[in-house]
Regions:
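Residue-level signature of catalytic and energy-coupling elements of molecular machines
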Residues: 25, 45, 82, 110, ...
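Conserved Walker
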Residues: 46-49, 70-72, 90-99, 129-136
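Conserved alpha-helical scaffold flanking the Walker A/P-loop in AAA+ ATPase domains
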Residues: 32-35, 88-112
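Loop/turn-to-beta-strand initiation segments
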Residues: 41-42, 67, 103-107, 129-135
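Walker A/P-loop
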Residues: 34-75, 88
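Conserved AAA+/SF3 P-loop NTPase catalytic/coupling segment centered on the Walker-B
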Residues: 103-128
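Pre-Walker A (pre-P-loop) alpha-helix and adjacent loop at the N terminus of AAA/AAA+ ATPase modules
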Residues: 6-51
Length: 136
């Protein structure tokens, strides 16, 4: 019988092997990203355009079976686009919550520096506290 630690190592090696079929030459990045995901942490990837950051995020979500969302940040992205918002359902007369992009297992925030400070704060709150405030 395998010990839990050996099982985690074997599964991690299998995951990395699957990812290497899609992402070539980024072994260190794959390893650190997998470690961050397993630790329920966050990772900041900085690189020039076109080197596969989005492809890597999609590959991780598929290999690990995680839900995935991506937002291309611009100055017109609102905090409610990230956290969600309530809208009136005119047929029932009730308010319904529409989930924002951050409600997923793996979220890619592309060009976060272009967002307004309020939008950045909404995302950072969700990251730090693992929850967020949304008006209902």
């Amino acid at each position: 019988m395998e010990t839990p630690k050996l099982s985690i190592v074997a599964n991690s090696q299998n995951i990395l092997q699957q990812l290497r079929k899609v992402i070539v030459g980024k072994d260190s990045t794959l390893l650190w990203t997998l470690a961050a995901i397993l630790a329920k942490g966050h990772i900041l990837l900085e690189d020039i355009p076109g080197v596969g950051k989005t492809t890597m995020a999609v590959a991780f979500s598929k290999v690990l079976g995680l839900s995935y969302n991506r937002v291309q940040f611009t100055p017109d992205v609102l905090p409610s686009d990230i956290t969600g918002y309530s809208v009136l359902n005119q047929t029932t007369g009730n308010m319904e919550y529409k989930a924002g992009a951050v409600l997923c297992n793996l979220f890619l925030a592309d060009e976060l520096n272009r967002a307004t400070s309020r939008t950045q704060s909404a995302l950072l709150e969700a990251m730090e506290e693992n929850n967020f405030s949304a008006l209902r």
